[in-house]
Amino acid sequence: MGRIKNNNKGLSLVFIDREETEGTMMLYIRNEKETDYKLVEDITRKAFYNMYIPGCVEHYLVHIMRGHEDFIPELDFVLELDGKVIGNIMYTKAELTDEEGSKKEIVTFGPVSVLPEYQRNGYGKMLIEHSLNRAAELGYEAVVIFGSPSNYVSSGFKCCKKYNVCVEKGKYPAAMLVKELKPGVLDGRIWFYSDSPVMSIDEGKAQEFDDSLEKMEKRWMPGQEEFYIMSQSFVE
């Protein structure tokens, strides 16, 4: 069982009792520092390589995101386990527009990354829940993300159609999930979602960036087909 202490600087200190080994793990969630940049990009690369496509682009997105006007540094967190950075989460601003043209600034997160050898231990969920709490403290009222529902419903995300949040042509992607940070804030209207331009990745530049790094083997994985099916699916 973890015991969490928070302060007003966006830092969490978590003590997790080991059940099968001696001692106690100390886990910090803190804002990313400039000295973390290359390490975080490497963590992201290792976490996503061959997950959705042969190779990945998420580490390049991290690389360019920090310099974009929609990046939110206050919601840029890393997770340290016993002094070692093993995961991170980053946020950008996004926008909802209702049928009358009224706009609402919201947030989206991603990538959220954990080193492969530390995955499926709840660390990603810790990053998500810590950052969502901080986003609410900063006054943001809703979060829209794209991802596998099984990874996010336990953190309170629901199908976008339940909140009448759609993309162009009024479609409701199965992978688009919504969480209200202010209950009822999306009630009574149909919303069209737009993410930040930084999310439109130049695949050529992403490949050049990947080629500049230590070589990793690109290969096909069964999960890539699952991702394709989910990304092409819509809720009626």
Tell me the role of every PLM-derived stretch.
Residues 7-25:
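Short, Lys/Arg-enriched N-terminal segments with co-localized hydrophobic residues
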Residues 27-40:
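A short beta-loop-alpha structural element at the N-terminal edge
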Residues 41, 48-96:
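Active-site rim helix/loop that mediates acceptor-substrate recognition in acyltransferases
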Residues 84, 102, 115-126, 138, ...:
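Conserved glycine-rich acetyl-CoA-binding loop
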Residues 94-108, 119:
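A conserved beta-turn-beta hairpin within the catalytic core of GNAT-like acetyltransferases
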Residues 109, 114, 120-133, 144-145:
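Conserved acetyl-CoA-binding loop-helix of GNAT-fold acetyltransferases
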Residues 137-141, 147-171:
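Conserved active-site alpha-helix within GNAT-family acetyltransferase domains
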Residues 185-236:
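Acidic/histidine-enriched, glycine/proline-rich intrinsically disordered or flexible terminal extensions
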